[in-house]
Amino acid sequence: NGYNPPVPSILYALKRFIKNIKLSGKIQSDGKYFSINLKETKPQNMPRYSKKRTSITLPYRGISHHKICVVSSIDENDNLLLEIVGFGRCTTDMLKDSLGLKLSNAKSINADSASAYQEFCNEYKLTLNAIPSGFHSDGAFNIFEINGVHSQLETWISKFRGISTRHLQEYLDWFVYIFTMKKRFLLNKVKTESYSKILIDNNYIQSNDIFKVKMPIDLNIAYAEYLNQS
C-alpha cells in the first residue's frame, strides 16, 4: 500500500499563494492524468468494490473516466498552473474553469490539436499553435517546457509512494510553489525565507480542518457503474 504522508498545514496555506498566479504572453499547455487513489477512505465510504490482485486486464485502459485530469500550463515567465478539473479527456469547459480564470494579457497557446483547445482559444481570442497528435513540436512551436514540468512532477510525486486523491491538489500546489521559488530565489534561501512568507498573517489552520478535506472531484462519476449495480 505504501506510505501515505501526513498533510502539513503549510499545504493549505499555499492556496493563498497559488490563487495569485496569473499566466500571460506565450503559454504552453497539456493535460496530465493520474489514477484515482482512495487512501484514507473508510471501507463504508468506498465508491467501488475492493480491488483484488489478478492477472486479468483492467477494464479501462488509457485515458478514461477512471483517470483524473489535471490542466497543466506554463507561460514564458515560468508561471505554472496545475489544477484538477475532472475525469477523462480535457474539455473546453474544463479549460474555462481553470486556465480561463488565470489568464492575464495572454497572447498564444502551444497545445495539442484537440478540439477543446481550439474552441477555448477561439472564445478567449488567443492564437493556438497546434502540435500534431503524437508530437512534441511543430516547426518553431513546441510543448517541451510543459512536458519537462510533467517529468519533474512525476519524479517528485514518486517520492511519496502514493498520494490520496483527497489531497492531490494540495500536493500539486506544493510542487508549483517549489518550482516557482527555484526560479525566483537562490536554492539555499527557499526554506529559510520563502516558505515563511506565505505563513504570515491569517494562515492558521487547525489539524481537524485537514481531516475534513473533501474530495476535489465527484467520485460517483468515475464509479457510476458500481453504484448502478447496488
Short names for language-model regions:
Residues 1-230:
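Residue-level recognition of single "structural anchor" positions
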